[in-house]
């Protein structure tokens, strides 16, 4: 593999440097779009409205930003975290306080898709990915849990919205967090932020942070582990080339074989990313109190373009 230099983006003085092999567009820099929130997460691009919607978790709000109208409140939430569009263009949202997965219908109603497994309430659903068959794959660590665990672990699930069926996919992660499919759906990336004493099983307390790449069969079954990246992440996204964009201190970019390609420096610690803009070459970054963007070379791999 040929050498790919790291990217350094310096906001002071508006200077940006990108190498010829950079995933960042020539001359592009990380730009702050909005600030003043408490903790931002879960950005999702709404193509028909040309705006990005994202969570402000502690304030229990979904916010929205567009180039035309700037920043405003989109709607109240129950401490929503990760968001994504389903194949019909509806927002799917993971809610900490309500411990559920909801779908925001076209008329604005929020429909609960799932809040339990085997009669026990989820911990606090964190992030969600949609497969091309419409199923929702989501992580359930306890970051928003305010009481005791009902489920004896921090698991990854698959939800069929058509039937309401929920099945467990992964039980052997300490704190599953970000989750995303490869462009063709043949791989699933799941981030684990590592062990701490919130896990009900002490065996998980010393787990290291990581990102695991799993095979996914054509029938939608989880396959074997393909490789593991020895760094964790919060939310993640992939571009059309299959490059993985993670949020560990800054935005880290990995190749399809798990090799680190670049670091995109962000003034605040990022929590999640999504692709958007009319050509899907804008990376929106939620980072602590703010929303940022940077223009990229490759478009994002998203399940929905223009339908909403």
State where each predicted segment sits.
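Bacterial N-terminal signal peptides
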Residues: 5-16
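Sequence-structural signature of mature extracellular/luminal beta-sheet repeat domains
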Residues: 19-308
